[in-house]
From Swiss-Prot:
Stated family: Belongs to the UPF0301 (AlgH) family.
Protein name: UPF0301 protein PMI0339
One Gene Ontology CC term in the entry: cytosol
UniProt-listed Pfam families: DUF179 (PF02622)
Disulfide bonds: none
Organism: Proteus mirabilis (strain HI4320)
PANTHER family attached to this UniProt entry: UNCHARACTERIZED PROTEIN YQGE, UPF0301 PROTEIN YQGE
NCBIfam families (UniProt xref): PRK00228.1-1 (NF001266)
Gene3D superfamilies linked: VC0467-like, VC0467-like domains
Length: 187
C-alpha cells in the first residue's frame, strides 16, 4: 500500500486534538514511514502576508491584485517553525518534489519570494510544520479505523473552502462523514 498523493481523512472517533476532523495530504510514503500536511487546520491570526513580513520578504514586483490574506495551515506537530508550500507545478525552485501531475511541495525560501507576484505558482497552500509516522505506524492507525484514505484531488487542496475539506474529502469515496459510525469494525 502506497499512500503518496492520497488524503488521510480522520474518522469521527479520532479524538487527538491535533488530528480531530483533519485531512492530511500524504507527501511521502515508503518503507520507512510517511509524511504529510494537514490541509484544513488554519493557524489563528497567521496569513501568508504576515509570514512574509516576519521573514522580511518584500518582492519588488509585488502585484497588489494578488491577495496574501490567505491563512497559513498547521501542517502538523513536527518542525512547526518550518514552511512547506504545496503548489501547482512550476519548475525552478531549489527544493521541490513533484508529488503528482498537479501538485508539488517546496520547502525553499525562493518559492516564498514569488508569492504575491506574477511569478507565483497558479495555486498554493502554505503550512508550518508537518505530520509524520514511523515505519508501520500509519498502516496500524488505518487498521485501527483512525483514518479513511482516498486518492487526493487538487480541487480539495486548493479550491475547496477550508471548513468543507473534511466533508468533501470523504465524499470522494461516497461517504457522508457526519453519519459514519465511529465504531466501525473489521469483517
Amino acid at each position: 500500500m502506497n499512500l503518496l498523493n492520497h488524503f488521510l481523512i480522520a474518522m469521527p472517533s479520532l479524538s487527538d486534538p491535533l488530528f480531530q476532523r483533519s485531512v492530511v495530504y500524504v507527501c511521502e510514503h515508503n518503507e520507512n514511514g510517511a509524511m504529510g500536511l494537514v490541509i484544513n487546520k488554519p493557524i489563528e491570526d497567521i496569513s501568508i502576508e504576515s509570514v512574509l513580513e516576519q521573514l522580511e520578504i518584500f518582492s519588488a514586483d509585488r502585484d497588489s491584485a494578488i491577495s496574501l490574506q490567505k491563512p497559513v495551515m498547521s501542517g502538523g506537530p513536527v518542525a512547526e517553525e518550518h514552511g512547506f508550500i504545496l503548489h501547482t507545478p512550476v519548475s525552478g525552485f531549489s527544493s521541490s518534489i513533484k508529488i503528482s501531475d498537479s501538485t508539488m511541495i517546496t520547502t525553499s525560501k525562493d518559492v516564498l519570494e514569488t508569492l504575491g507576484t506574477a511569478r507565483q505558482p497558479e495555486k498554493t497552500l502554505v503550512s508550518l510544520g508537518y505530520s509524520s509516522w514511523e515505519k508501520g505506524q500509519l498502516e496500524r492507525e488505518i487498521l485501527e479505523n483512525s483514518w479513511l484514505t482516498v486518492e487526493a484531488t487538487p480541487q480539495i487542496i486548493f479550491d475547496t473552502p477550508i471548513a468543507e475539506r473534511w466533508h468533501k474529502a470523504a465524499e470522494l469515496i461516497g461517504i457522508d462523514i457526519h453519519t459514519i459510525s465511529p465504531t466501525a469494525g473489521h469483517a
